[in-house]
């Protein structure tokens, strides 16, 4: 609301969809020298939810077409359009369609980033009329997906370049297990698909200046991390003792590996002197699972079935280990944040977890976490126990330091995106 008051009204235009004229209000805001444009339509945008509405197809088609028309309205000489996920996938489709009959759009190149292939924007074949595109787009080499239309498929087909949010995920989605029904399309267009690993905002996630911590610390005084650990134990009513704390800050859904957690948690808490802290919401069965373990092991596990940003900062700073046994993970942000705070990730080697976490080698002293390969609960349990074994020796500090030295900001990723942009506008 603070920024909205500073928006400048630039004018309006209309978008034609399904034989209707739809109003588009245009607002501009300049922030740190960058011009931002905002599109307004009360019917489509004045909702309680960004998505999850019954008319999502029509809403996002409208937004996508309006974005492309905006370029001509403001007379912006655009080199590259970069869209993300199914919600704006149709931007790239419209850009290609407009280029067929309008020289203004002919030289524009397009990039599309897949953050999670699971969510594709699939709608009934009848929805094609809402797009105002030719029936020719209902074909195997365009939007057709079985007897439906698929926005994400359209972007993969019509974009000049496609990226995923990690290099390993770009390889994984070529196979049916990870491909979510689009693996054939991914293999067909593999030549234009690459992975660029996400980073984190290190100004927000900075243990040296984080306002939410009980005590700030850095690589130079990592011993002060223990102050946060003790305060975290007090905050959640856990005994203040020197045992490893394992945390999960996550959505409680199946792809986060929670079936593996379900299978081993009872044995883990029965046999190991540890404490576990959970923060997150999700599927009812997993919420109840952690409530049950909290009831059974009240002195060992604290289940916080909600999300709170301030508490997440405190957990990242106070925990010793972060558990991420994901079945698939396009990039993963939690492990990057955890390492920034010297909290050691224990992960399954998939997607971005494989790219960013290297299992510790006790001989070379290299590695910033612990990992396992197979989707196997006892492999996970073995890895947790291996992590515990290092907690009690001098190598633990080395692993913490390796984690905090890991470079997970946006600098490297930004350079890779710039390189990609330069390649396609040569």
Identify the residue ranges that each predicted region occupies.
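Catalytic cores of nucleotide-sugar-dependent glycosyltransferases that transfer UDP/GDP/TDP-activated
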Residues: 1-426
């Amino acid at each position: 609301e603070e920024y909205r008051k500073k928006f400048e009204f630039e004018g309006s235009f209309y978008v034609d969809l399904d034989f209707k004229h739809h109003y588009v209000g245009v607002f501009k805001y300049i922030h740190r020298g960058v011009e931002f444009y905002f599109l307004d339509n009360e019917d489509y945008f004045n909702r309680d939810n960004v998505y999850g509405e019954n008319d999502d197809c029509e809403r996002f088609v409208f937004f996508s077409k309006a974005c492309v028309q905006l370029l001509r309205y403001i007379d912006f000489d655009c080199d590259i359009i970069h869209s993300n996920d199914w919600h704006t996938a149709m931007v790239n489709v419209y850009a290609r369609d407009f280029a067929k009959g309008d020289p203004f759009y002919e030289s524009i190149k397009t990039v599309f980033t897949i953050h999670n292939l699971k969510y594709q924007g699939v709608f009934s074949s009848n929805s094609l009329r809402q797009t105002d595109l030719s029936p020719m787009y209902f074909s195997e080499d365009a939007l057709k997906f079985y007897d439906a239309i698929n926005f994400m498929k359209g972007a993969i087909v019509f974009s000049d370049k496609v990226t995923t949010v990690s290099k390993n995920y770009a390889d994984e989605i070529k196979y049916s297990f990870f491909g979510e029904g689009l693996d054939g399309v991914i293999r067909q267009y593999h030549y234009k698909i690459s992975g660029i690993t996400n980073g984190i905002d290190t100004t927000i996630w900075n243990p040296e200046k984080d306002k939410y911590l009980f005590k700030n610390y850095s690589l130079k005084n990592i011993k002060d991390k223990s102050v946060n650990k003790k305060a975290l134990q007090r905050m959640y009513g856990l005994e203040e003792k020197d045992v490893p704390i394992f945390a999960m800050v996550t959505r409680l859904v199946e792809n986060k590996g929670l079936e593996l957690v379900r299978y081993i948690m009872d044995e883990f808490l029965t046999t190991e002197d540890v404490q576990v802290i959970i923060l997150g919401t999700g599927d009812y069965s997993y919420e109840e699972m952690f409530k049950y373990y909290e009831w059974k092991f009240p002195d060992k596990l604290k289940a916080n079935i909600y999300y709170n940003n301030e508490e997440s900062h405190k957990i990242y700073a106070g925990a010793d280990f972060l558990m991420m046994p994901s079945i698939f993970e396009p990039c993963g942000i939690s492990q990057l944040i955890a390492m920034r705070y010297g909290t050691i990730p224990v992960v399954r080697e998939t997607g971005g977890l494989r790219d960013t976490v290297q299992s510790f080698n006790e001989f070379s002293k290299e590695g910033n976490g612990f990992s396992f390969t197979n989707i196997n609960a006892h492999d996970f349990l073995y890895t947790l126990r291996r992590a515990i074994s290092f907690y009690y020796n001098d190598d633990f500090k080395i692993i913490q330091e390796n984690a905090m030295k890991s470079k997970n900001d946006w600098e490297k990723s930004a350079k890779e995106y710039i390189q990609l942009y330069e390649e396609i506008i040569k």
